[in-house]
From Swiss-Prot:
GO terms for biological process: dGDP catabolic process; dGTP catabolic process; DNA repair; DNA replication; nucleotide-excision repair. Specifically hydrolyzes both 8-oxo-deoxyguanosine triphosphate (8-oxo-dGTP) and 8-oxo-guanosine triphosphate (8-oxo-GTP) to the related monophosphates, thereby cleaning up the nucleotide pools and preventing misincorporation of 8-oxoGua into DNA and RNA. It prevents replicational errors by removing an oxidatively damaged form of guanine (8-oxo-dGTP) from DNA and the nucleotide pool. 8-oxo-dGTP can be inserted opposite dA and dC residues of template DNA with almost equal efficiency thus leading to A.T to G.C transversions. The keyword Magnesium applies. Monomer. It catalyses: 8-oxo-dGTP + H2O = 8-oxo-dGMP + diphosphate + H(+); 8-oxo-GTP + H2O = 8-oxo-GMP + diphosphate + H(+); 8-oxo-dGDP + H2O = 8-oxo-dGMP + phosphate + H(+); 8-oxo-GDP + H2O = 8-oxo-GMP + phosphate + H(+). A motif (Nudix box) lies at residues 38-59. This is 8-oxo-dGTP diphosphatase. Its EC number is 3.6.1.55.
Length: 129
């Protein structure tokens, strides 16, 4: 079984909105909403990975972030470890740098059914902030 380590950025602005993107139609979990992030590379820490991934995917450099949640999740074809980082200060303005649609969404507007199933506990925790 494939094992993946994923670093994810939950970008929260001063209006308590979260920046989300939509997965590509040909990606695993196609067309689902997601928090930007990606695979942790060999020799990279989760902290380094979230900085790199947010620079690559949404064009920001995190300045202040903290571990929000770490989860293990089993899919039929893969086991993933997800490191969710709450990013509250950054340089730049987030946008879909890789062509993916991106938008700010209120915490109230987050619906776990619109995201991959591994995100459900994180969305529930975010709504309690």
């Amino acid at each position: 079984m494939k094992k993946l380590q994923i670093a994810v950025g939950i970008i929260r602005n001063e209006n308590n909105e979260i920046f989300i993107t939509r997965r590509a139609a040909d990606a695993h979990m196609a067309n689902k909403l997601e928090f930007p992030g990606g695979k942790i590379e060999m020799g990279e820490t989760p902290e380094q990975a979230v900085v790199r991934e947010l620079q690559e995917e949404v064009g920001i450099t995190p300045q202040h972030f903290s571990l929000f949640e770490k989860l293990e999740y089993e899919f039929p074809d893969r086991h993933i470890t997800l490191w969710f980082w709450l990013v509250e200060r950054w340089e730049g303005e987030p946008w879909g740098k890789e062509g993916q649609p991106g938008e700010w969404m209120s915490l109230v507007g987050l619906n776990a059914d619109d995201f991959p199933p591994a995100n459900e506990p994180v969305i529930a925790k975010l709504k309690r902030l």
